[in-house]
Amino acid sequence: FAIQFYEILVGFGVAGTGFGVILAVVGRASSQENRAMSLAIATASGSAGQIVGPIVAVFLLESMKWQSVFMIFAVSILLVLLLLPFMRAPERASKDEIEESLSEILSIALKDPSYMMIFVGFFSCGYQLAFITAHFPALITEMSAPIDPAGWCGDLGIETTAALGGFAISVIGAANIVGTLAAGWAGKRYGKKWLLSGIYAGRSIAAAWFILTPITANSVLIFSFSMGFLWLATVPLTSGLVAHIYGVRYMATLYGIVFFSHQMGSFVGVY
């Protein structure tokens, strides 16, 4: 029970420091014209942390126990609090936002087909991401064609299909940073709903192509980069769309509800 209790606390900690809270703060502190790019930078930074974090953890584990490494990461996260005084959100919301209470905004949003489409779309996003993260490496390990030592895999030191599966996840993470920043740049110039539609369509096309193609190192690399480029590109566009439609005053609550659908999709995808 004690272990499960700590796991629950970790879940609350992740929720309290996740995209729902961070993007709301960034969204409120950003101007309308720069909001999409600001949200993209915040999202991409999280992806960069997922790349750098494991490398640092492995380095530290060579010289200390995992408990000490855990405490080092915890303290480093607490140090982020020192940056809070530099965050400058608008002192007051617009007149329209002040006149509408949270209950009124929620009532409007829950009856709005656009909000429901965002909700459903983010559910599918969570399903796709969690499904690939949980099952893609195992699929490559079991189903991929043998590695050619004379090919690019051999040049990178990838000798087994299991290593190729781990490399594929790394490619997804690296491409995700580029794709997220590109989505933020595009969201400033083009309609967010059309960009989101294109991203979801692109994922479907990439998945269909991979399923219908023999699984080789080359197809794994192409699919990993394509899916990685579209991985979290939905986040700055979705959060920016919520802020654009309903304002930033209750963005944390409204985006939190949408992100809840993302997590439900993630659960279904892993299960």
Label the model's feature ranges:
Residues A42-A89:
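Helix-loop-helix hairpin linking two adjacent transmembrane segments in secondary transporters
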Residues Y6-A44, G247:
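Cytoplasmic helix-loop-helix junction between adjacent transmembrane helices
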Residues R88-E104:
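Flexible cytoplasmic inter-helical loops of multi-pass small-molecule transporters
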Residues D112-A183, G269:
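Extracytoplasmic gate region of multi-pass secondary transporters
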Residues L164, V171-N176, A182, G187-L241:
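C-terminal transmembrane helical hairpin of 12-TM major facilitator-type secondary transporters
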Residues A2-T17, F123, S219-A233:
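Hydrophobic core of transmembrane alpha-helices in multi-pass small-molecule transporters
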Residues A36-P54, G256-G269:
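Glycine-rich segments within core transmembrane alpha-helices of 12-TM secondary carriers
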